[in-house]
């Protein structure tokens, strides 16, 4: 009989959390962790903050020390890309052609940065998703060129613009939305963020990008400007394209049993097919509390969902493996599956601003923002959908006060009750 195996595809925060939880919950069989990057699991949020600032060296990003990874007894496949998954036979095919027979698979491949086709092959145009991306951008910003154009005014673009401005660069932040992060946080909070960026010297432009200008006609052409759709020319030594991401599901599209529209579609238990679960940025699952499908690209969710997927997979295997796992499944693993019902949390640091949010902000049909202290950049915003509060965001408030707002979202509370709760919390 072949050895029992679970494969976790994706070696970032969600994949690591899943691997650790599988061992903690009783899996003693082979545990394969596949990652397409050559690095051991590392933390991504500091790429646009501490690493870009120069405050951290790359080694500080590692999520676990080497001896901690060794203790997990992993079949570690770094620098290895998954090529296909056959859910009917639970066979994972790697890019080199190796085929792994699995009892279970957890997909945690995350997302890839979106790019602009007009920027292909241009030196000085960057994205920011991987460690290599961050190091390349950091090196570029350490050079003589001081003019940075950031294309995309979402969370990542705003964070990178803030860091570059603090490093002394001339920064122009370009976005289709009229205000920074407006698609996520709404107009009133967006106005507050816009005021902070302007006060720090960032130039804000609302426009689509029409193309790029570059010098030379050889194999290496250096970007010199960004052209906006209205014809405006923005001189640039460096360009960061931060226009969102695409779920890394291309390798799964050959299996008709999987729905890969906007991530890997899962049920409330994070299951995409029998024995196949998903976690992190790539997972689109049915949230029982919010009553709709969510795909959450937040660091905390990656860890929580990785653990949930591991627990639910082992609960399924405890019931379905014909031989009880042949010793690969400890008795403690035979627990019931549980729906994944997190209260999503994210944070963003921009200059001295600490932005924290609980719940779901996008898709809101109503918003109530309270500016507690405009001069001190302190504010709270409540987001609702269908008569209930679904999300809350705070800027500049003490952590304990922000955590107190979480209870309004966890249930979630009726809209009027939540509004009263916010007013009481900031009074």
Regions found by a protein language model. Name each.
Residues 2-74, 161-184:
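Beta1-alpha1 glycine-rich phosphate/pyrophosphate-binding loop at the start
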Residues 12-16, 38, 111-113, 132, ...:
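Residue-level detector of alpha-helix initiation sites
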Residues 1-7, 63-149, 227-229, 238-242, ...:
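FAD-binding core/adjacent interface of flavoenzyme oxidoreductases
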Residues 2-4, 284-398:
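Mid-to-C-terminal Rossmann-like scaffold of FAD/NAD(P)H-dependent oxidoreductases
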Residues 123-144, 217-219, 227, 233-308:
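FAD-site-proximal beta/loop scaffold in flavoenzymes
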Residues 5, 230-258, 351-427:
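C-terminal catalytic lobe of FAD-dependent flavoproteins
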Residues 136-185, 189:
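Rossmann-like NAD(P)H-binding beta-loop-alpha module
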Residues 28-30, 70, 76-94, 100, ...:
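A Rossmann-like FAD-binding core segment of flavoenzymes
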